[in-house]
């Protein structure tokens, strides 16, 4: 019956129908392929480098990028394409295996050197004091739990965003003080990074600083005000402390720790709370999620906060709080493999403060 009906149809109509069906199928296949590629890229799979211009235009739109000239846009596109190559290489790295993935993010039009210069900020001031007492932790590590995370006890404040102000040192320092305050008073407060940026006479504001010198400067100033009383503006200014507004936290001392191995860091973390630490941030720029196993260790340039540790699929990891906003990494956090000095995390001495 269907054969007879087909014979009765006008041949030109049949040709038209066939053309429409084929065209729709082709469009569907192409659309599916493009969507699949985009979805795979979002999940950290390989980016199709032939589609780099499309990825870049989407990136510009998604992150509201504005370039001052065609020359600048072309330069950013070139860097963006280089970063795609690196992301693909990292996602195919057998060292990290399936544990860490990388993807396009808001930094993907910046070179590593540009990002380190603008969005980190760990550096050595010309004048370096050292009032913090050094403690050597040479006892064998305790047999503590395999998993521990201060976030689960509501002792870690929200993710901050330092922007293009190189004051990671202030953010990491105060994040640890905020956690110690929460451990003592069972409530979270946001302290003023801008106060340290403006009023710390040793460190260099948005041009860099160190963790232990920040603790020392807090002691010299007498304390820290809240973020509400002295809000963040992300640039260097003259010190604008209002002496009529109270310091909510004061410090009476600080410590720096020498440890025989990373395992001892677990004991310290559980005992004193989240710990500010120095790292090399070059390899975490395009991080998306998972545990980083392979991370550069070519010089410390960024400060972050150690908040926990655990094991995933047999891989032991550390959890760090970053200061690049909650739209980066795992909602603002990242994880690295334990016991490999990932990102140079144990190159410098860990520091903590003592609340008054």
From Swiss-Prot:
Name listed for the protein in its UniProt record: Viral cathepsin
Signal peptide: 1-40
Post-translational modification: Synthesized as an inactive proenzyme and activated by proteolytic removal of the inhibitory propeptide.
Taxonomic path: Viruses, Viruses incertae sedis, Naldaviricetes, Lefavirales, Baculoviridae
Disulfide-bonded cysteines: 165-206, 199-239, 295-343
Family from the record: Belongs to the peptidase C1 family.
GO terms assigned for molecular function: cysteine-type peptidase activity
Catalysed conversion reaction: Endopeptidase of broad specificity, hydrolyzing substrates of both cathepsin L and cathepsin B
Propeptide cleavage-removed residue intervals: 41-144
UniProt cross-references to InterPro entries, sorted A to Z: Papain-like_cys_pep_sf, Pept_asp_AS, Pept_cys_AS, Pept_his_AS, Peptidase_C1A, Peptidase_C1A_C, Peptidase_C1A_papain-like, Prot_inhib_I29
Organism: Lymantria dispar multicapsid nuclear polyhedrosis virus (LdMNPV)
Gene Ontology biological process terms in this record: proteolysis
Coiled-coil region: none
Keywords from the named record: Disulfide bond, Hydrolase, Protease, Signal, Thiol protease, Zymogen
Gene coding for it: VCATH
Short name of any one Pfam family annotated for the protein: Inhibitor_I29
EC number: 3.4.22.50
Active site location: 168, 302, 322
Protein role: Cysteine protease that plays an essential role in host liquefaction to facilitate horizontal transmission of the virus. May participate in the degradation of foreign protein expressed by the baculovirus system.
């Amino acid at each position: 019956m269907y054969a007879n009906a087909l014979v009765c149809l006008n041949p030109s109509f049949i040709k038209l129908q066939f053309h429409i069906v084929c065209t729709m199928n082709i469009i569907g296949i192409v659309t599916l392929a493009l969507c699949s590629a985009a979805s795979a890229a979002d999940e950290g799979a390989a980016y199709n480098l032939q589609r780099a211009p499309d990825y870049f235009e989407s990136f510009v739109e998604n992150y509201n990028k504005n370039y001052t000239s065609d020359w600048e846009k072309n330069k950013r596109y070139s860097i963006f394409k280089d970063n795609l190559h690196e992301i693909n290489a990292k996602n195919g790295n057998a060292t990290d295996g399936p544990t860490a993935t990388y993807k396009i993010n808001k930094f993907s039009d910046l070179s590593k050197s540009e990002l380190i210069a603008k969005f980190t900020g760990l550096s050595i001031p010309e004048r370096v004091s050292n009032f913090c007492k050094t403690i050597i932790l040479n006892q064998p590590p305790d047999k503590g739990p395999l998993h521990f995370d201060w976030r689960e006890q509501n002792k870690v404040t929200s993710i901050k965003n330092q922007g293009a102000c190189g004051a990671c040192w202030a953010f990491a320092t105060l994040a640890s003080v905020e956690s110690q305050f929460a451990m003592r008073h069972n409530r979270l407060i946001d302290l003023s990074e801008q106060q340290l940026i403006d009023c710390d006479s040793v460190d260099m504001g948005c041009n860099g600083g160190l963790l232990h010198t920040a603790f020392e400067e807090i002691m010299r100033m007498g304390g820290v005000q809240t973020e509400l009383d002295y809000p963040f503006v992300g640039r260097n200014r003259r010190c604008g402390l209002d002496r009529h507004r109270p310091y909510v936290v004061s410090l009476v001392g600080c410590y720096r720790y020498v440890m025989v191995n990373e395992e001892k860091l677990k004991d310290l973390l559980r005992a004193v709370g989240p710990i500010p630490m120095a790292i090399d941030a070059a390899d975490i720029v395009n991080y998306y999620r998972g545990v980083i196993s392979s991370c550069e260790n070519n010089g410390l340039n960024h400060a972050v906060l150690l908040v926990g540790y655990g094991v995933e699929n047999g891989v032991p990891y550390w959890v760090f709080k970053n200061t690049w906003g909650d739209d980066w990494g795992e909602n603002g956090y990242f994880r690295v493999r334990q016991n490999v000095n990932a990102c140079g995390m144990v190159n410098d001495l860990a520091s903590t403060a003592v609340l008054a």
